[in-house]
């Protein structure tokens, strides 16, 4: 990896690049929800007598979990991956990359066949 390019730009799999970009995106309005969940649980454990601490902490946890659920539900690839045990993930990613490479090979072969029949395909000549 080069020192200037982000890992997301160097990932050959666009889905992995999108996941990386989603997980590393930061803004002032949207902070990471996992630390907030742990902080809310810490507040519950060390309650200092405030009456609505429990409700505040649990509502924060519920809100962050809803954000997480919505983010996962919006991506079919994430749903598929999360339906598998974590120890299977590297094998699944490897399999998906092999499938992509096989599709690229088929595409190259089809392009070669078309060029043999119709002549070279030129992007500038295409309508």
From Swiss-Prot:
Please list which residues make up the signal peptide. none
Q: Which GO terms describe its molecular function?
A: structural molecule activity; transcription coactivator activity
What GO cellular component entries does it have? core mediator complex; cytosol; mediator complex
GO BP terms in the entry: negative regulation of transcription by RNA polymerase II; positive regulation of transcription elongation by RNA polymerase II; positive regulation of transcription initiation by RNA polymerase II; RNA polymerase II preinitiation complex assembly
Top-level lineage group = Eukaryota
Keyword line: Activator, Coiled coil, Nucleus, Transcription, Transcription regulation
Which residues are in coiled coils?
Answer: 95-119
Q: What is its main location?
A: nucleus
Q: Which Pfam families match?
A: Med9
| Compartments where found | Nucleus
Q: What do we know about how this protein assembles, alone or with others? A: Component of the Mediator complex.
Q: Which family does it belong to?
A: Belongs to the Mediator complex subunit 9 family.
What is the purpose of this protein? Component of the Mediator complex, a coactivator involved in the regulated transcription of nearly all RNA polymerase II-dependent genes. Mediator functions as a bridge to convey information from gene-specific regulatory proteins to the basal RNA polymerase II transcription machinery. Mediator is recruited to promoters by direct interactions with regulatory proteins and serves as a scaffold for the assembly of a functional preinitiation complex with RNA polymerase II and the general transcription factors.
Q: What is this protein called?
A: Mediator of RNA polymerase II transcription subunit 9
Which species is listed as the source? Eremothecium gossypii (strain ATCC 10895 / CBS 109.51 / FGSC 9923 / NRRL Y-1056)
């Amino acid at each position: 990896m080069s020192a200037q390019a982000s890992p997301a730009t160097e990932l050959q799999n666009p889905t992995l690049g999108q996941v990386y970009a989603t997980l590393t995106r930061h803004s002032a309005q949207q902070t990471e929800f996992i630390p907030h969940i742990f902080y809310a649980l810490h507040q519950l454990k060390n309650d200092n007598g405030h009456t609505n601490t429990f409700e505040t902490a649990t509502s924060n946890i519920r809100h962050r979990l809803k954000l997480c659920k919505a983010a996962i539900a919006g991506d079919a690839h994430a749903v598929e991956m999360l339906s598998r045990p974590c120890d299977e993930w590297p094998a699944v990613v490897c399999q998906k990359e092999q499938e992509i490479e096989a599709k690229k090979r088929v595409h190259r072969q089809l392009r070669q066949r078309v060029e043999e029949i119709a002549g070279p395909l030129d992007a500038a000549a295409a309508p």
